[in-house]
Amino acid sequence: EGCGTFMLGYESIDGAPVTFNKWLLSDKLRGDWNYQGTLITDWDNVGRSVWEQKVKPDYMHAATDAVKAGNDLIMTTPQFFDGAIKAVRNGLLDESLIDEAVSRILALKFRLGLFEDPRLPDEKRIKAVIGSKDHQDLNLQIARESVALLKNNGALPFSATPDKRIAVIGPLADDAQNQLGDWTGNSGQVNWMPDGQPRDMITTVLDGFRQLVPEGCEVVYSRGADIIDLVDDPEGECYPDGQPRPKIGVSARFDQRLLDEAVANARQSDLIVAVVGDVVQLVGETCSTATLELLGGQNALLEALANVAKETGKPLVVVLLSSKPQVMPACVIGTNGVIVDESAADGTSAFMWAPNPGMKGGQAIAEIILGKTEP
């Protein structure tokens, strides 16, 4: 019963990194609170104390203090092993403390029955279950319920009759992998799925419209803008511990050709759907930005499409596909920034937020816009 494992964060409390906080881990957690489980560091906590936080002079002292504080499992610090051995040989670390950590790991495995049944991955079950129809149906239902229609001046639902033309525009309108969000196989933290999840299992917003509209209703696509360019980290190819540094995402340069193509497509259409937001290089662990503004050419794209909507009277639906709060331009939310205001923003008829809706997210978004699902 209860929690079997705690993972320790990178943060410091009162100047003491959590990984080395003996009072918190041993005196309070294991002592006063009688915690019987194991403690595991986050990715390279011990190593980062040497090469990033610079609170430990070397791996020998870092390993010593990590074990003394009460850590059991040291995640992804290759130098910990030699550092701990050197600490024992130099009299800095009592070997009995290592024995205690090992005993807690073994005790957890015994409680879970892993020595009798290691519960290794079942390849046949993996192929049969992961991405199964039940999984896809569940994701679709969750996506339908998670998408929020923040503003609608009456443009939705849109009636996609055979004589209509729909322009689906934006850098995320047909971006299968970024629709899934962080930690989904090609997030930058791992390289075992460099091409991401299987494309044929993902329904983008563009896919969703093409699947749902009746025969004769034309759906066209323009990228319209780029979000980021990936560049080498100026700090070098590898971290000081030898692990590779991922590329850094910087705001993409404005591309007039992409914008012109999108505007031309929008002018000829009866409905304009703009899908904007962020990508995995801008969110999650090790990735943050100094602004919540849309990056790259996205604001310019939205303003141009809003102008088309004003000139032609055609509805513009803006979809924010993002896993964090973002600052939207006035053409989407109005000059007062109050999206629940009854008056329409200048050029935008409807605005919806889809927080990384997953493999069937594009279908859910298209269903809501076309009136097949209640938001």
PLM-predicted stretches and their roles:
Residues 15-17, 34, 50, 81-95, ...:
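C-terminal non-catalytic regions of proteins with extracellular/luminal or membrane-system context
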Residues 1, 103, 107-126:
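Conserved, charged catalytic cores of large soluble enzymes
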